[in-house]
Design a protein with these regions (language model features):
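A short alpha-helix capping/helix-coil boundary motif
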Residues: 5-6, 50-52, 145-148
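Short, solvent-exposed loop/turn segments at secondary-structure junctions
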Residues: 25-26, 89-90, 201-203
């Protein structure tokens, strides 16, 4: 069934390539794993045409969600969820170039698109454009990019006045739970962006970062997982606020200890 869906999309003139991402692109998936499908376009496909195709294969459809990228979020007739993300191949290429060859660091998730390119499974690529992109970006981690990511994340973590660690300390003192949660999420997004760059690993995205780092990073702070878990155990206990701040400072100290 799923292959027929892919085939119908591949017959549209707007489609230049289709790639499968997420766990389904590798070996770590089971029969219930979702499908993350990236459809690369030279021009938009109108919603009516997408709906016409998807309605044959899906029991539930949300067409045209644009909370992040343009996507259709659906449930296949067999009950498995599928997410179709529509991208301009030209814009995707420009973003990759900006990151990998122009060495532009972001506040977090800097190399996610690069990781997505390298780890996706090609389903349709008649002109070889996507495969060519994979070959172009199958390169050693640029040292200038690594340097820029580390510098930017250190500023965000604790060196700049509005750094996340300072904001967390203020939020803990106020016992502002929502701010504590929000700033902590930003802190660790920045933290892992730095850690993956330090280890010259592309960023796998927001899921299972701790496990991915343990498996793929040779440079890890002392008591890496234990200290992070301790911080979260303390964070939402009002009487443990000071200890949460101390633990956060330990996380920063041990991260800096492994920097070149």
């Amino acid at each position: 069934m799923i292959h027929e869906l892919f085939k119908e999309f591949s017959q549209l003139e707007q489609v230049e390539a289709i790639a499968l991402g997420g766990s389904r692109a590798g070996q770590a998936y089971d029969q219930n794993s979702d499908y993350d499908v990236y459809v690369y376009l030279n021009s938009p496909i109108d919603e009516a045409n997408r709906l016409k195709i998807l309605s044959k294969y899906c029991s539930y459809m949300e067409i045209g969600n644009q909370f992040w990228e343009l996507e259709d979020d659906c449930v296949l007739n067999n009950g498995i969820e599928i997410e179709l993300i529509y991208r301009s191949l030209e814009s995707f290429e420009q973003e990759l170039n900006s990151t990998v060859f122009q060495h532009q660091a972001q506040n977090s998730y800097t190399t996610c698109m690069w990781h997505n390119l390298l780890h996706s499974k090609i389903l349709y690529d008649p002109n070889g454009h996507y495969a060519s992109l994979q070959r172009t970006y199958q390169i050693p981690y640029p040292q200038e990019l690594k340097k820029h990511i580390i510098e930017r994340q250190l500023l965000l973590l604790d060196q700049a006045m509005p750094a996340f660690s300072h904001q967390i300390e203020k939020a803990i003192k106020r016992q502002d739970l929502l701010s504590m949660n929000h700033r902590t999420s930003e802190f660790f997004a920045s933290y892992f962006d730095l850690l993956f760059a330090l280890n010259e690993q592309t960023h796998p995205g927001e899921k299972r970062m701790l496990e991915y780092a343990k498996t793929n990073c040779t440079l890890l702070p002392k008591q890496f997982e234990e200290t992070i878990r301790k911080y979260f155990q303390l964070l939402y206990q009002p009487q443990q606020g000071e200890q949460a701040v101390v633990t956060l400072q330990t996380i920063l100290k041990e991260l800096k200890a492994i920097l070149p």
